[in-house]
Amino acid sequence: TKISKHGLGLAIDINTLYNPYVKEKADGSWHIEPATGEPYAFDRDNRTDIPYKIDHNDLAYRLFTEAGFEWGGDWISLKDYQHFEIDL
């Protein structure tokens, strides 16, 4: 069994409600975690009504990426706006 990056202390999820995990399914529908984060999952770049939104201007983004972490919001195949991880 492989231990996850979270389990190894190499990843963290921040404020999951406002920064959900979003992936398109094969049938064109969306998988969103947590499901209650759906109102915050789309058109994030143009919205100012999302409290605690992590984006490229956010302090959490700047601090984590400056420390060498990768942000899940930059991923192409899915968006994991809550997620930061680092490889050691």
Q: Where do the PLM segments sit?
A:
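Catalytic cores and adjacent binding grooves of peptidoglycan-active enzymes
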Residues: I3, L8-L88
